[in-house]
Amino acid sequence: MFKKSVLFATLLSGVMAFSTNADDKIILKHISVSSVSASPTVLEDTIADIARKYNASSWKVTSMRIDNNSTATAVLYK
């Protein structure tokens, strides 16, 4: 029982530490990309190109829709 409690506490603290680190990032810009019949990889590559253009340290895709007019949104971080 003790081992399970320690394992659970360790996992929980790791999740809490990760979420704290993610919240510490400074938002640089919100972006949206779209393309006709694009694959997720194409949209993600476009987001990466925009992130490099703005010298973002990282980015996170916040939404993606793939159909005849594919779109994705992302947040760029300093």
Swiss-Prot record:
GO terms for cellular component: periplasmic space. One of its GO terms (biological process) is response to stress. Disruption phenotype: Mutants are more sensitive to HOCl treatment than wild-type cells. Induction: Induced by RclR in response to hypochlorous acid (HOCl). Residues 1-22 form the signal peptide. It is found in: Periplasm. Keywords: Periplasm, Signal, Stress response. InterPro entries: Dodecin-like, RclB-like, YdgH-like_sf, YdgH/BhsA/McbA-like_dom. Its main location: periplasm. Coiled coil: none annotated. Disulfide bonds: none annotated. Belongs to the BhsA/McbA family. Probably involved in reactive chlorine species (RCS) stress resistance. This is Uncharacterized protein RclB. It comes from Escherichia coli (strain K12). The lineage of its organism: Bacteria, Pseudomonadati, Pseudomonadota, Gammaproteobacteria, Enterobacterales. The gene is rclB.
